[in-house]
């Protein structure tokens, strides 16, 4: 089973609107020459008989196609959880830039609203991952092995949502030479998408757009539920949004703090 490295609150990255703080411009993604000739939705990895029959196959294809091409993606999440005995809503965002074949990457994860404000900047390559973490006024550095694929592509967080629902094909089309399939959730196992202490999922909707290579280009999920801790009951919300901003190789700038972190 895939598990998100970001945890239940999905910590997130903040980027100033219209400002790319991570690296150089991306090389625009080029649709594959076979997209226009795709025979139907069942040609998409993991899709069969008009539904998402094998989410793990789709996610594996997503990881491979995204990492080989290079990309920029954006992940946002609001989730209500129990923290320190209180019902709180965590707001997070992560934005990630990855060079082709994962030779270098950067991402920033921030969280706030119901949690101590924090920011984690990560730079890495095929040998090492370096993190600068700031919680309040405290700054710490750490190093470790390269980031896992699902930390970069988002598949670790998408996994429970895709495996926890039945998705059926709602639409297929070709746009700018790229074959796209839209699937929507028609039934959901609430235990797969709710946090601990969450019950009674309602008004839940989920939608995913994939291309012929299996890349998840868009994912949206939202709903309400009840959160209980001790004698306290509150209203919970889940609101997840993922999108691929661009595909293609790019230059990744190495942050000036990396030497400090490597020597710490």
Ranges and model annotations:
Residues 1-77, 82-124, 129-130, 137, ...:
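Hydrophobic alpha-helical segments
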Residues 192-194:
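Acidic- and glycine-rich mobile interface elements
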